[in-house]
Amino acid sequence: MTRRRWPATLTHLDLLRPARRVWTSCLADCRLATLEREVVGVVREDDIAGGLIPSLYFDFLRSRRAAPLGRVLAHNRDDVLTLVGLLGWFGKALTSREELSAAELGGLGRLWEPVDVERALDYYRAALAAGLSGAPAQAVRLNLARWEKRSARWDAACTLWEAAARDAGFDPRPWEELAKFHEHRRRDFVAARSVVDDALGLAEGAGVSSRVRDAFAYRRARLERRLLPRG
């Protein structure tokens, strides 16, 4: 546009990053077409594929026939309207949680985490309370437990680690955290060894890597040494 400055004072707002944080765990992808269909609830009819637009533009440069560009302009118009719809979704979601799914609550936790940890933790707790399940729930539990640990809220952290340890499929991370808590915070070596024994039993059945099993075995041997009578 002949190098003229944009007259508006508002800065550019890129919705791609927040969209990825919110929906990456519950949608197949975060392409605009997917967000338009699954979030905004719009299905386009007779839309031109974005990959065809460059060739239509070069055809126009050669032929000077502008008619085929009508579908391109309609496509771009619909893209902008979808972004308006997404912006409206974010505006509503950040002021009211009533219609949000458990997965979206977890995604909003990820969105807030870099700038407002306590608000992020509130969303994570809400996601779990709303019935978040599977791998997204496991990720939220462990992330939430990490922040509870940083704040020395040990009861809350242990509750989350215990829930994560009960998750279907063996995940060594909560077991390791529980073992470290009992050994280093409570100085309860018997409880720590019991956690490690349970973890080793599950690890054997789950067929995890030898590196994981060796780490637990090393921890158990150290606990055994600490339990020996001091002479």
Where in this protein do the model-derived segments appear?
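Residue at a conserved register position within TPR or TPR-like alpha-solenoid repeats
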Residues: 112, 148, 182-183, 224
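Structural motif corresponding to the intra-repeat A-B loop/turn of tetratricopeptide repeats
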Residues: 114-115, 151, 185-186, 227
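Short coil turns that delineate tetratricopeptide repeat
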Residues: 132-135, 169, 204
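Structural register within alpha-helical repeat arrays
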Residues: 108, 143-144, 178, 192, ...
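Metal-dependent phosphoesterase core characteristic of DEDDh/y 3'-5' exonuclease domains
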Residues: 1-78
